[in-house]
Amino acid sequence: MPKHYRPAGKKKEGNAAKYITRTKAVKYLQISLATFRKLCILKGVFPRDPKKKVEGNHKTYYHMKDIAFLAHDPLIEKFREIKVHRKKVKKAFAKKNKDLADRLLNRPPTYKLDRLILERYPTFVDALRDLDDCLTMVHLFAALPAVEGERVQVQRIHNCRRLSHEWQAYISRTHSLRKTFISVKGIYYQAEVQGQKITWLTPHALQQVLTDDVDFNVMLTFLEFYETLLGFINFKLYHSINVNYPPVLDPRLEALASELYALCRYMSSGRVPGNSEPAGLIEDKEGEDNKESSKTDESELRLAQLQHQLPTNEPGALMHLVQESTAADADDADAKECRSLFKNLKFYLSREVPRESLLFIIPAFGGTVSWEGEGAPFDETDEDITHQIVDRPTQSHVFLSREYVQPQWIYDCVNARIILPTEGYIVGRVPPPHLSPFVDNDAEGYIPEYAETIKRLQAAAQSQVLPLPSLGDEDMENSLVEAIIDRSESNEIADKKRKLEMLEKQYHDELRMEYEGKTFSNRTADNQPDVVDKSDTKEADDHMEDSHKQAEKDAADISKTLMSRKQRGLLQAIEINQERKKDKVNLLKKRKKNADSSASAKGR
Amino acid sequence: PRNPSPSRRSAAAAVVQGEACVEIAATMMAEEGTQQLPYVRETVLKKRKVNEDWAVKNRERKAAKRQRRRDDGKGAIKRPEDFVREFRNKELDFVRMKTRLKVRKLPPAETLNSKLVFAIRIPGTMDLHPHMRRILRKLRLTQVLTGVFLKATDATMKRLLVVEPFITYGFPNLKNVKDLIYKKGRGFLDKEPFPLTSNDLIEKALGEYGIICLEDLVHEIASVGPHFREASNFLMPFKLKCPERRLQMKKKPFKDGGDSGNREDKINELIEKLN
């Protein structure tokens, strides 16, 4: 019962008035449990955990304001309409009235979730922050089959496939991809869009088997919401780079199973604004330009629109656009590094490599890519190809002008941000370990061997930039100057440290001699007193060590005593975590040692 | 996962749980000095158990549903009129088949648009003449809404003409070939079907013909290569999904406004509806 209804003799206050159990909430809303679950998912309502559970610990509690929030939503009425419509159809079929059933099925009640997206994400950045789960779910369903038993519809799977390809095309076009990692579950990607890091997981391009342990109703409700969300985000992102949305693909490329390439081609051709832009976008731009002035006359608006349409006829319009895009892109050094990683490289993908993933990654880092089959931009016999990605034990024909590498080389180059040497990735060879870019090795305390190698290669690549002062780029000059300053400072610090160490050593030696109270002349004179002196020295050293340990322990105890109980517990938790981490690192080192010893044994 | 939730809340719950674990572990170590015992919250264990119970019940419920559907067909009373009608339908189908073979002249297989044919069994009557039933079994189209890839030869086209009222076929494009094999393909190895979730099984079955991965299989089927027969026999018939609104599936030929027979390139639209 809500709080506002108070029958005589029954008052509710405190948690009893604030929280409501699930059964009572379902009764209050007068919908079924399945519809209640669906509504909670769409509106973002989740159970609460009150400290005092009025009706027992075993029940699920919802906040009363959340339930009122659901009660006032138009969706609840729409769901009731859908239920009534389904009953009507069932009744018509039962009465063998096929005409009525067909008429009812032709006009089903539908609903849209656009209002919910605007309600839950007031600004665009809020939507981008919540995009990880959305992208993972959409990419998962794009790879699932439409099986008869489940309620996964064919149209929904096609929609997910289209949305995922559109998202990948945008990331590839704007060079926003930052990290990739191949795992057993699938391929992880991380992109940076408008300052937000977005990470998602794509299943491998193999068949997915649906298990019966999964409740697809809940997943389909989430998917319904996420499809709408990704549609909105794609719309806004595409318009931010002056491309029409939804895109119109080349039907020939679509028929040849090359949707991602068709999307990239569409984005390249659709770059020019002007006639292709809708009028609303022009008005939006006008609004942005005239923020200062509170009034806008019709004549001024018309004149501005004409001025905007004018540059499409001038020859310098494209140069202006290029300059604008260059200026905008110059802000982000990370994006600049990513866009030029694979520049001037030309890739050809063999049939057996994961084509969709590499078609997404290689253009995102500035490379040119082709594959086997119709609709590909160039053929295998092109002499300009620099790398061919293969994963097959034998090759039909080997061209001497290119390198044959395994697909892992691409992912490792992307994570290292440099072109790695290809010796380790040649066909037929076991590639180096594929390291996760999401792990911070310094924080973990264990740096794998290959990570060390990559660091060295990165340092070498950085040092190659130093002897190029002739470039006129300001960013390059600044980075060069900073590099020089850092190098000189580090040299000075190293020198100072070395001197200090030498001085400290001398001081320690002199102190020890003074403590012993002996000189070289005394030592040479007597032999038997030397033995006695040595034993005395040992005892003295032991005493010194004991005193040192005691001093350290006393200091620690004093500091612990000064802490409060909460701080002491926190310190103990921190120590336990550090101990656990050390154990993990030791386990890794032990494994590595065992692997090395077994490898050497095999070598014999 | 039964209730997938945004990862932020999961992370928050994990953090809270971790803190609880750490606190209790610290207390135990402070008191007893023994090794830390594993700790999982009671509600988490309950939720896990409920999920497992739900999975078991769900499996049983689905099996019972399938059994019930299978039992519905048994025990039905058939009247003599049904037998008579069935026999007459068989005879009529046979006569129509012979007439169709006599009247219709097939163009040579080389003049067709493509060498690859995808045939789908459409819903139809149970009253099949034994001759047609035998040919459908040879084409492996014994179940409704299943499909197979075939090579467009004169013999194959003649067989398809014989069973035309019960199938529809056409020339698929590369996109649909790829979609069908990637999503619905099932291999047949050691007298047992298995899903194509790994390249090792494909290499084990077809490695001697140079087909070592899923993409090789797609290429062989799409281009009708020299080992098309082995590749096609390796793939089980594809089970397609019934659309929301049931197709009318009239027995008239497609060019006459029905649903059976040769659709040529329009088969792609149908495949996109069913896959």
Swiss-Prot record, chain A:
Keywords: Nucleus, Ribosome biogenesis, rRNA processing. InterPro entries: BRCT_dom, BRCT_dom_sf, PES. GO terms for molecular function: mRNA binding; ribonucleoprotein complex binding; RNA binding. SMART domains: BRCT (SM00292). Pfam families: BRCT_2, Pescadillo_N. Residues 282-299, 531-557, 577-586 have a biased composition (Basic and acidic residues). Required for maturation of ribosomal RNAs and formation of the large ribosomal subunit. SUPFAM superfamilies: BRCT domain. Residues 275-299, 518-557, 574-604 are annotated as: Disordered. This is Pescadillo homolog. It is found in: Nucleus, Nucleolus; Nucleus, Nucleoplasm. One of its GO terms (biological process) is maturation of LSU-rRNA from tricistronic rRNA transcript (SSU-rRNA, 5.8S rRNA, LSU-rRNA). It comes from the Eukaryota. Belongs to the pescadillo family. CDD domains: BRCT_pescadillo_like. GO terms for cellular component: nucleoplasm; PeBoW complex; preribosome, large subunit precursor. Residues 337-427 form the BRCT domain.
